[in-house]
């Protein structure tokens, strides 16, 4: 699932927090140009998310395990791989205002100068 950790920009020295991963019912993508966050609800993804769940070997997470197992048992659509799923999700999200694209793999960036050169700090929280 998701996590949050403190960071300091190696370029400008700005201190900030980075959130990655997402949650029980949404994904968290970042802009590949400025680092801005974008949440994408599983409900808004509709059938493509159900196809992804269908292809998993187990539930997506503990919080949705009953739902996920039911989808895996009863959903009639074809399963989709994680790679295919990520491509579809990224294609459905609008471009960032800065002109960049929201992706699952974008590195954390400083919110002040947008540098990807960040130093991971000691404060860390896992969201499972």
What would you call each of these model-derived segments?
Residues 24-33, 48-54, 112-114:
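Short, surface-exposed linear segments at secondary-structure transitions and domain or protein termini
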Residues 1-21, 28-31:
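General detector of N-terminal leader/presequence modules that precede the first folded domain
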Residues 20-28, 101-109, 124-128:
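Short linker/helix segments within small regulatory modules
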Residues 2-5, 20-22, 37, 41-92, ...:
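Short, intrinsically disordered terminal segments enriched in charged and Pro/Gly residues
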Residues 9-12, 31-34, 95-98, 110-113:
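Short cysteine-rich clusters marking metal-coordination/redox-active sites
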Residues 15-17, 37-40, 100-103, 116-118:
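Cys/His-rich microdomains that often coordinate metals
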Residues 77-78, 93-95, 99-102, 110, ...:
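Low-complexity intrinsically disordered segments
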């Amino acid at each position: 699932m998701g996590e949050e950790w403190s960071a300091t920009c190696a370029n400008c020295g700005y201190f900030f927090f980075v959130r990655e991963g997402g949650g029980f019912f949404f994904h968290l993508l970042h802009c590949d140009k400025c680092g801005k966050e974008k949440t994408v609800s599983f409900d808004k993804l509709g059938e493509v998310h159900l196809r992804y769940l269908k292809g998993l070997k187990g539930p997506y997470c503990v919080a949705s395990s009953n739902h996920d197992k039911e989808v895996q048992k009863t959903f009639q659509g074809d399963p989709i791989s994680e790679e295919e799923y990520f491509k579809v999700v990224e294609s459905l999200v609008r471009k960032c205002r800065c002109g960049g694209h929201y992706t699952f793999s974008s590195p954390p960036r400083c919110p002040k100068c947008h540098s990807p050169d960040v130093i991971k700090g000691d404060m860390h929280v896992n969201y499972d």
